[in-house]
């Protein structure tokens, strides 16, 4: 998988949002907000092609989290990104 080009992560106060930076990507009816963990995963995903296993490893390396819990969170995050249309 990979992120769709044109979506940028922005921090507003204590929250993170994904912003479509071209008119084709802007949907004024939907804002994609991310928590700190999902923002970390997005930054990892932006580095290139990724899968659940690679994001899980990055999450475990960065945070003190059990691999099983990390994989559950990563899969849920990827599913939400697919639903939002920000990855392919």
Name these PLM-found stretches:
Residues 1-40:
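Acidic, low-complexity/disordered tracts enriched in E/D and polar residues
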Residues 30-88:
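Long, charge-rich, low-complexity alpha-helical segments
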């Amino acid at each position: 998988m990979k992120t769709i080009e044109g979506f940028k992560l922005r921090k507003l106060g204590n929250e993170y949002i994904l912003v479509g930076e071209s008119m084709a990507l802007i949907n004024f009816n939907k804002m994609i907000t991310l928590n700190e963990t999902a923002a970390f995963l997005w930054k990892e995903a932006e580095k290139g092609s990724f899968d659940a296993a690679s994001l899980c490893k990055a999450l475990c390396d960065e945070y003190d989290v059990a691999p099983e819990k990390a994989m559950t969170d990563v899969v849920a995050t990827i599913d939400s990104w697919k639903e939002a249309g920000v990855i392919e």
